[in-house]
């Protein structure tokens, strides 16, 4: 499929309010990133990659919708290592948002807690998700977007 046609086909939302085409849900992290790739309401692939691989893939594939777990700095008692991890994760989220802005994609941030709602739902059992915790989190954020969010 030509690149322009593929981009046109992967619109962020259908008229029903549900995503159409290919879109991604992401669990960001300093070292490990979980990525779930959806085709409409069907989970396609789910895997783990590095932050650098994620940014390269976002630019290469330019998904028109990206659902990503948000991150906030809550504790003033973090160790130096935890603070570095927090900063790197925030930079990664900003990088994804900047890339999407450059090509016209839409980014939706979700609170980390919503993944638990998705994982307790009856729809979670229908998904074939690898045991990796980052990948499971990414898939849960996608499922939450599909079944519970107000888009």
Task: Locate predicted features.
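Phosphate- and other anionic-substrate recognition elements at nucleic-acid/protein interfaces
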Residues: 1-151
């Amino acid at each position: 499929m030509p690149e322009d046609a593929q981009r046109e086909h992967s619109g962020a939302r259908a008229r029903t309010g549900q995503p159409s085409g290919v879109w991604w849900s992401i669990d960001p992290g300093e070292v490990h990133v979980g990525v779930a790739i959806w085709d409409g309401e069907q989970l396609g692939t789910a895997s783990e990659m590095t932050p650098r691989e994620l940014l390269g893939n976002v630019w290469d594939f330019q998904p028109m919708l990206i659902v990503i777990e948000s991150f906030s700095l809550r504790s003033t008692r973090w160790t130096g290592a935890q603070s570095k991890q927090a900063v790197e994760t925030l930079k990664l989220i900003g990088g994804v948002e900047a890339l999407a802005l450059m090509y016209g994609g839409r980014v939706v941030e979700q609170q980390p807690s919503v993944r638990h709602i998705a994982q307790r739902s009856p729809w979670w059992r229908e998904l074939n998700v690898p045991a990796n915790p980052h990948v499971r989190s990414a898939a849960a954020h996608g499922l939450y977007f599909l079944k519970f969010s107000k888009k």
